[in-house]
Amino acid sequence: MPSQQKKIIFCMAGVFSFACALGVVTALGTPLWIKATVLCKTGALLVNASGQELDKFMGEMQYGLFHGEGVRQCGLGARPFRFSFFPDLLKAIPVSIHVNIILFSMILVVLTMVGTAFFMYNAFGKPFESLHGPLGLYLVSFISGSCGCLVMILFASEVKIHRLSEKIANFKEGTYAYKTQNENYTTSFWVVFICFFVHFLNGLLIRLAGFQFPFTKSKETETTNVASDLMY
């Protein structure tokens, strides 16, 4: 492939990576990871509510990795509330999983910025077969994509398996019990998904620029070495 086309491809990949890093940094600070609807089970059972009557007992909340807000309803009007995970909810949430989500998100940001630098260096510098060359690009893209995947898996497990929304809704609620009715991933979660997809796309762009996948190259080299041994 001509040098000019390689520069364009690497520049595109660098811009994509930089946009991903900015997106994930923004996503970390927003309460837009998930939106949940919760039912005041105690109140609904007391009055035997059904159908449209349940709307009076439906609350909702949205939250991210650090803070969130919502409205509780138990038949007596809306009660807005705000919360933060640190330090308010430390005793109510699976702390190890939550901290790992934040940690892998930060690693994702750092590696994505490193990937941006690598792509720009390969576009305008003179890279060789070293860590900052094609091997480095594949390595950073793979690790970054893996971190993005881990963030999504861990967050989904915290929400679904550990019932994070229910724990938040029932936090410091001695009288009423709340049950999750519906949960939807929102903007920030999908930003991480897009970032994961972009790192996969960057791997394809590296291949499009004419650089073999590392494992493919190793197989070809091994085949050549075996052929040479047979000849001699």
Swiss-Prot record:
Glycosylation sites (chain numbering)? 48, 184
Report which residue ranges the record marks as coiled coil.
none
Q: Membrane spanning segments where?
A: 8-28, 101-121, 135-155, 186-206
Per UniProt, the keywords (alphabetical) are: Cell membrane, Glycoprotein, Hearing, Membrane, Sensory transduction, Transmembrane, Transmembrane helix, Vision
Q: Could you identify this protein by its name? A: Clarin-1
Residues of the signal peptide:
none
- Membrane disposition: Multi-pass membrane protein
Q: Name one GO biological process term.
A: auditory receptor cell stereocilium organization
Q: What does this protein do, in the record's words?
A: May have a role in the excitatory ribbon synapse junctions between hair cells and cochlear ganglion cells and presumably also in analogous synapses within the retina.
Q: What is its main location?
A: membrane
GO CC, one annotated term: stereocilium
Cellular compartments annotated: Cell membrane
Into which family does the record put it? Belongs to the clarin family.
Keyword Transmembrane helix belongs to the record: yes
Name the encoding gene, please: Clrn1
